[in-house]
UniProtKB/Swiss-Prot annotation:
Keyword Nucleus: yes
Homology family: Belongs to the SLD2 family.
Protein name, per record: DNA replication regulator SLD2
Bias (Acidic residues) ranges: 82-91, 327-339
Alphabetical UniProt keywords: Cell cycle, Cytoplasm, DNA replication, Nucleus
PANTHER family registered for this protein in UniProt: DNA REPLICATION REGULATOR SLD2
Cell compartments where the protein resides: Cytoplasm; Nucleus
Entry annotated with the keyword Cytoplasm: yes
Main subcellular location of this protein, as a coarse class: cytoplasm
Species per Swiss-Prot/TrEMBL record: Debaryomyces hansenii (strain ATCC 36239 / CBS 767 / BCRC 21394 / JCM 1990 / NBRC 0083 / IGC 2968)
Compositional bias annotation for Polar residues: 140-149, 160-182
GO biological process: DNA replication initiation; double-strand break repair via break-induced replication; mitotic DNA replication preinitiation complex assembly
Biased composition (Basic and acidic residues): 150-159, 416-429
Function statement: Has a role in the initiation of DNA replication. Required at S-phase checkpoint.
Length: 459
């Protein structure tokens, strides 16, 4: 193919120029750059024309193959132009409008043209829509009679889209069954005719009701729930049995009203059957008053021994008193339990909320001197001071004498050691130095000055 060789040569020359331009300018050439150089512009133009011709020839060949494959599809192509004429017209149009196309290259292309889901080629100018089914050769159009009349009247050159005919819509409520029941297996046309006739005549429709007689005739009650069955009705009297027999006789009658009234009047709630307990098999008699049941709680005592003990209890008065005391204590305990139960029902006792203690609780001794009368009210102070001094001197002398006595006892080994009584009359009111070792933290002594100040600050 000479066209294919020339196209490849033109393509190579264009690519060489594009690469050189990109190296020199560091960008891809645009349309304005192509139009600046006339030689390059001619190369692009000739390449485009040759490429279009080759594409047209390929499309014609593809179309011929499709026509040979789709012989069954009835497409009216008699009025369309032949392939050769279309190619010639297309070439003429391309040669005439080449300059116009170069000017309008900047415009955007529209969507791809399609018809009946198939992409249209350049030659599919007057493609008529095919019929919906390619397997059946239909006579006339695929629309209604109104469209066929319009097609006969319209000229053959023009093609018009078929219009939809108006169809009377049918409400689903019109297809509901009526009281006049017919055969169930109706066709669709019969149902539609019935709905249209019901719409015209406006017959009142009602909800269908069940046939109670047929239901009662086909009704079968299980044996354990039957009205005549007295297997599980343990508490029924003779009157109820008579009523059940009457119901059984009425069920055999032909009148439906009698059957319904008797069933409604004598309905008995079904009782769930329960399994009866198995009989207890005792090897001995189950009497609770047997001696081995009464007195065999951990000891195998005889009845005679228990009787003798009872006699001894009656004769001994101490045992009787102790038993009575135990009974009274048990009664008191029972009373306490009842009181506790009563209080428990009233609700749990809550501890009273008081002020929280933030400091240490000290032991405060009462001040007894304030309660007594003032002894020095009518006394001479100087005399009292002298008495105190004399007592202090006397105590000191006694203390010194006691120490001297201890020293003499240590020196004389022959004499026996006599233990001094701490509660001796001579030692009363004197300081005991041994006890001073054990006196610690005496902060609450009312005779101390700090304690008195602390009490005054609290007031």
């Amino acid at each position: 193919m000479p066209h294919q060789e020339s196209i490849t040569q033109l393509k190579q020359a264009i690519k060489v120029w594009e690469h050189e331009f990109q190296r020199s300018n560091n960008r891809i050439p645009s349309r304005s750059d192509i139009k600046v150089d006339p030689k390059v512009y001619e190369l692009y133009k000739t390449y485009k024309v040759l490429k279009a011709k080759t594409n047209n020839v390929r499309n014609i060949q593809d179309k011929r193959t499709l026509e040979s494959a789709n012989i069954g599809i009835d497409i009216n192509m008699s009025e369309s132009q032949s392939d050769a004429e279309d190619v010639e017209e297309f070439n003429n149009e391309n040669s005439d409008s080449s300059n116009n196309k170069l000017k309008n290259q900047d415009t955007e292309l529209g969507p791809t043209p399609q018809a009946n889901g198939k992409v249209l080629s350049i030659l599919d100018i007057r493609l008529t829509p095919p019929d919906s089914s390619p397997l059946k050769n239909k006579v006339g159009s695929r629309s209604t009679d109104t469209y066929s009349n319009q097609k006969d009247e319209a000229p053959e050159d023009t093609f018009k889209t078929p219009t939809k005919t108006r169809v009377n819509r049918i409400n689903l409520s019109e297809l509901t069954p009526t009281n006049n029941r017919g055969p169930r297996n109706k066709s669709l046309m019969q149902k539609l005719e019935q709905a249209s006739s019901a719409k015209n005549t406006r017959i009142e429709m009602h909800t269908p009701e069940r046939n109670k007689v047929s239901l009662l005739q086909n009704m079968e009650t299980p044996q354990y729930l039957a009205k005549v069955n007295n297997k599980f009705n343990f508490d029924m009297d003779d009157d109820s049995n008579d009523k059940d027999n009457v119901v059984a006789e009425d069920l055999h009658t032909n009148s439906s009203m009698k059957i319904i009234s008797s069933i409604r009047s004598n309905i008995i709630d079904p009782i769930t059957p329960t399994k009866s307990p198995a009989p207890l098999k005792f090897q001995v008699s189950p009497s609770p008053l047997k001696p081995h049941r009464l007195f065999s709680f951990g000891n195998n005592r005889k009845l005679s021994d228990i009787f003798n003990d009872y006699k001894n209890i009656k004769e001994d008065p101490d045992l009787i008193n102790s038993i009575e005391n135990e009974e009274e204590a048990a009664e008191l305990d029972d009373d306490d339990d009842t009181i506790e139960k009563d209080t428990a029902t009233n609700g749990p006792k809550r501890k009273r909320i008081t002020q929280k203690r933030t400091t240490r609780r000290w032991k405060i001794k009462p001040n007894t001197e304030e309660t007594k009368e003032d002894k020095l009210k009518n006394a001479n102070i100087h005399d009292e001071v002298k008495k105190l001094d004399d007592e202090a001197r006397k105590n000191l002398v006694d203390y010194m004498e006691v120490n001297n006595m201890h020293e003499e006892d240590e020196t004389t080994s022959e004499e026996e050691y006599v233990h001094q009584d701490p509660n001796h009359k001579d030692m009363k009111g004197k300081v005991k130095p041994v006890r001073m070792n054990y006196q610690r933290l005496k902060i609450n002594d009312p005779r101390i000055k700090k304690f008195k100040k602390r009490m005054q600050n609290r007031r």
